[in-house]
Regions:
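Solvent-exposed loop and beta-edge segments used for protein-protein assembly and interaction
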Residues: 42, 71-73, 167-169
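N-terminal compositionally biased, intrinsically disordered segments and leader/signal-like regions
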Residues: 13, 24-25, 34, 50-54, ...
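N-terminal segment immediately downstream of the Sec signal-peptide cleavage site
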Residues: 37-64
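Predominantly extracellular/secreted and cell-surface proteins with exposed
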Residues: 45, 59-157
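Bacterial N-terminal signal peptides
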Residues: 11-21
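Bacterial N-terminal signal peptides that target proteins for export
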Residues: 2-13
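Bacterial Sec-dependent N-terminal signal peptides
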Residues: 2-3, 20-47, 175-192
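Edge beta-strand at a domain terminus
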Residues: 104-110, 116, 157-192
Length: 192
């Protein structure tokens, strides 16, 4: 438990360093930068709430640890997490105690980084993979799928066309991810 608290504290300290770095690296005209900007920390872990949605309706939700790490000479970040499996929402709008998503989801993306004059950082995906595999390795039972979802394969599926956009502001990571294979948007928020 103390290790997790230490990691969170170190993440916050590094975010303050990042914000300080960004404010000193603004252009003289103080306008948004058009190019990529360096990121000051090699690796950051975030405890986030992940919420898959269909047409703005929450389908499932859970907490998970995601990682941002610098790449391409610190001008891009790699965003990734593995084996997320949140609890499903019931018809009454509450999270189920025992019904979980039929798939475990893993995401790996390269995000371009832009520094904004308000001190925030914007992310937009350059490329990304989205993988969904059945929990416990068994094919999915059609009766356990959320209404409106018919995956391309009940034994699991993946795509290299996933996209994401988002921001990092005042230590809050917020991304909207689209697998581009299902009519799903996945909200990733470190400040819920």
């Amino acid at each position: 438990m103390k290790i997790k608290q230490f990691q969170q504290m170190m993440s916050m300290v590094m975010m303050l360093v990042l914000v300080a770095f960004m404010t000193t690296s603004c252009s003289k005209s103080d306008e948004d930068t058009d190019g990529l900007v360096p990121i000051s920390k090699e690796v950051n872990f975030y405890s986030v709430t992940i919420t898959p949605t269909i047409q703005n309706q929450k389908m499932a939700q859970g907490t998970h640890t995601v990682m941002l790490e610098t790449t391409n000479n610190k001008k891009q970040v790699r965003f990734h997490f593995e084996n997320f499996n949140g609890r499903m929402f019931e018809s009454n709008g509450k999270l189920s105690e025992n019904q979980f998503m039929p798939f475990e989801v893993s995401v790996d993306m390269i995000l371009n980084v832009t520094s904004n004059k308000d001190g925030s950082v914007s992310f937009k995906s350059e490329k990304g993979t989205f993988k969904a595999k059945p929990k416990d390795g068994k094919p999915i039972d059609m009766s356990k799928l959320p209404e409106g979802i018919l995956p391309p394969n009940l034994n699991g599926f993946e795509t290299d066309k996933a996209q994401a956009e988002g921001t990092l502001k005042n230590g809050r990571l917020y991304l909207v991810l689209s697998p581009m294979i299902l009519p799903v948007k996945i909200i990733i928020d470190s400040n819920n």
